[in-house]
């Protein structure tokens, strides 16, 4: 379908940006992989809390990975294991992997005035809200710090590199060097989250 859109609409391929949430994260990865095998590299894929169960720590052909596009950025917002009702993947799967609030449980999701259903999916869906806010806000940029762990980040042991810290969301840019680094940031518990 993407090939048809490219050929029939005159879309500017360099501006193509695929976005997937949960299981859809892996579907856009499959699309990117399929197009790459046909000689077309998708410029950017953003994945919002990619599904963890049945995908995490599996072969890269079965899930999103950095080879699926020129730039793959990932927001991990619900990385608890399925045993404790987490839906997202903790494993790094992109060029930039962002872990707001450590990636486990999002601020504001512990409120008692939400239904059980809302409680169960609150952290998982929060990645969508963060991404949407990164598009609509003119003053908020989710600056994230490279760090070995969330604990080190909270202890203030992480600094921005000389070129500055990357931002999470729509304005994310592919890093100049490919390193396996996690990026941490804090958010607010209510909208605006930044």
Locations of the language-model features?
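Generic structural motif recognizing short loop/turn segments at the entrances and edges of beta-strands
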Residues: 92-96, 141, 178-183
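Non-catalytic, well-ordered alpha-helical segments in soluble enzyme domains
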Residues: 120-141
């Amino acid at each position: 379908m993407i090939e048809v859109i490219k050929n029939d609409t005159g879309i500017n391929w360099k501006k193509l940006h695929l976005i997937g949430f949960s299981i859809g994260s892996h579907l856009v990865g499959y699309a990117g992989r399929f197009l790459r095998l046909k000689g077309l590299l998708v410029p950017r894929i953003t994945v919002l809390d990619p599904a963890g169960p049945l995908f995490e720590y599996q072969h890269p052909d079965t899930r999103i990975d950095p080879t699926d596009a020129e730039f793959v950025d990932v927001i991990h917002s619900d990385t608890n294991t399925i045993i404790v009702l987490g839906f997202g993947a903790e494993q790094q799967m992109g060029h930039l992997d962002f872990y707001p609030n450590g990636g486990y449980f999002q601020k504001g999701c512990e409120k008692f005035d939400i239904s059980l259903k809302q409680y169960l999916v609150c952290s998982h869906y929060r990645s969508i809200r963060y991404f949407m806010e990164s598009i609509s806000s003119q003053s908020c940029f989710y600056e994230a710090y490279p760090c070995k762990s969330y604990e080190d980040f909270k202890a203030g042991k992480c600094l921005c590199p000389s070129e500055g810290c990357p931002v999470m969301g729509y304005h994310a840019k592919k890093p100049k060097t490919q390193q396996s680094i996690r990026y941490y940031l804090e958010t607010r518990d209510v909208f605006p989250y930044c």
